[in-house]
Regions:
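Active-site entrance/lid segments in N-terminal catalytic domains of soluble metabolic enzymes
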Residues: 1-214, 220, 250, 338
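Alpha/beta catalytic cores of nucleotide-metabolism and tRNA/nucleoside-modifying enzymes
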Residues: 73-87, 150, 154, 192-223, ...
Length: 350
């Protein structure tokens, strides 16, 4: 599949979260045929050496971590570290995909462009293409930003047909879909905003298809959040996604920077935290999680193998054909005939 002109074997992107992606993970994911996105407003650009900070986050109790993270993330972003991290990824053969908020794009767009990032993700809760920013920052015009940046820009996150279509018309190289479904996200509880992911993906996929018919330009949509197993990924593509972005499955990799923990990037908000830190553990290497061989029976290892096998079972030769398979809403599929798995906490009963 292709995103922003970049061809990848695996339609899986690792989320721009500090417990998931650092330079090493971004490089390794690229070598394995996938992609990781480095958050340019996280620890990697606030600290020359983020490892002691990551150790602190992994060591504190449930009652202490929000206050600690608010303190740690209060350190200013250093523009020179933005340049350094992008160059570190590229010099090691990785794909320099990076993420910023709209406010961050306004502040650091020039530095990102000068450093030569390969792909930029602007991620926020999107309800229109004009974003309000703090008084000290000029509001970001997404269409103008996409036009002026020398590399492709992916925009999100949205959950409706109209907003997805607006983002495509603004010049998005890809549209991110999902508000609140992530394992470490609490936006739905804090803000009351969101749409179930399958519905959001289907609606935004319809916008993509209509825009492609109207303009001749096919803009991939990426389902971001709420996907834990290979089966989740397969179902999301069946609903119309071109690719997926996942966090917690990769946070469980031995190479992940989170030390077995995963947290939402809005967790350190000084005024209104909208994420939490969860203990996901360490279950295998990055290669085992992405390409196998699987050592777990719950669908969280060999995600690529699961997608290929599902496609073969359904007779889909490629992702486009996978998007055309029948989708049925059937909650009983998760429990039907699984009485022993549930009783013994095995497989699908975990």
């Amino acid at each position: 599949w292709r995103i922003g002109g970049i061809e990848r074997e695996i339609p899986i992107i690792a989320s721009a979260m500090d417990g998931v992606i650092d330079v090493k993970m971004a490089v390794q994911l690229a070598k394995l045929g996938a992609m990781g996105v480095l958050n340019l407003e996280g620890l990697q650009t606030r600290y020359e050496d983020p490892n002691p900070v990551l150790d602190k986050i992994a060591s504190v109790s449930k009652t202490e971590f929000v206050t600690l993270m608010q303190d740690l993330y209060a350190k200013p972003i250093q523009p020179e570290l933005i340049t350094q991290r992008i160059k570190e990824i590229k010099s090691q053969g990785g794909i320099a995909a990076v993420s910023v908020t709209p406010a961050g794009a306004s502040r650091f767009g020039d530095a990102i462009a000068a450093a030569g990032a390969d792909l930029v993700f602007i991620q926020a809760t999107v309800v229109s293409t004009a974003h309000l920013s703090p008084d000290s920052i000029t509001p970001l015009d997404l269409a103008q930003f996409c036009q002026e940046m020398p590399m492709p820009v992916a925009l999100g996150n949205c959950v409706t047909y109209d907003v997805a279509l607006s983002l495509m018309k603004a010049g998005a190289a890809a549209v991110m879909v999902g508000i609140g479904p992530g394992a470490a996200c609490t936006s739905r509880g804090v803000l009351g905003v969101g749409v179930p992911q399958a519905t959001a993906v289907a609606d935004c996929a319809a916008a993509r298809d209509d825009y492609a018919q109207e303009s001749g330009n096919y803009i991939p949509i990426v389902a971001d959040g709420g996907l834990v197993t290979g089966g989740d990924i397969c179902k999301c593509i069946a609903c119309g996604a071109d690719g997926v972005m996942i966090g917690s499955p990769f946070a469980r990799a031995a190479e992940a920077p989170g030390r077995g923990y995963h947290w939402g990037m809005a967790t350190p908000s000084p005024l209104l935290p909208r994420g939490t830190r969860i203990d996901v553990g360490t279950t295998g290497t990055l290669e085992q999680i992405l390409r196998g061989p699987a050592q777990l029976d719950d669908g969280t290892h060999n995600l690529l193998g699961a997608l290929r096998t599902s496609m073969g079972t359904l007779g889909a030769k490629n992702l486009h054909e996978m998007q055309q398979v029948d989708v049925v809403i059937a909650p009983s599929l998760l429990t039907e005939g699984k009485v022993y798995q549930k009783a013994q906490q095995l497989g699908m009963g975990k």
